[in-house]
């Protein structure tokens, strides 16, 4: 059981992306050899200027999520639409209704879908799953 997703811990498998989007971490990741750049976060969640997700990290996360979805028979789908209660349309980066997530949703969510307090990994969601 994971402990970082609050109420969703009982309903989820947690994956930790070991990279931070905040610009204050840029020099740290450059020194470690990450392939990152400064970029704009257009999700409306978190800081406006961020560092991009390293392509190797993005690939590893994407493949891990796909593998978990296959192994656990979880549909590889995400909250979309104007309120996150659709599987079609643009990705939704807001908080999705808790009752909907518990009773109706089956798929992949991020911290940003369950609480306003966390904005990771909204800024990288399109890179990861788009």
Kindly give the residue locations of the regions a language model identified.
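Catalytic cores and adjacent binding grooves of peptidoglycan-active enzymes
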Residues: 7, 11, 52, 60-63, ...
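Active-site-adjacent loop/helix surface patches within enzyme catalytic domains
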Residues: 1-76
């Amino acid at each position: 059981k994971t402990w970082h997703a609050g109420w969703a811990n009982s309903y989820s498998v947690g994956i930790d992306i070991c990279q931070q989007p905040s610009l204050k971490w840029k020099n740290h990741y450059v020194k470690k050899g990450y392939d990152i750049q400064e970029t704009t976060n257009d999700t409306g969640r978190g800081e406006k200027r961020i560092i991009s997700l390293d392509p190797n990290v993005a690939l590893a996360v994407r493949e891990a999520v796909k593998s978990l979805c296959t192994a656990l028979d979880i549909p590889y789908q995400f909250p979309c639409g104007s309120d996150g209660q659709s599987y079609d349309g643009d990705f939704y980066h807001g908080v999705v209704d808790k009752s909907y997530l518990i009773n109706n949703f089956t798929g992949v969510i991020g911290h940003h879908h369950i609480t306003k307090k966390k904005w990771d990994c909204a800024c990288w969601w399109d890179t990861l799953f788009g």
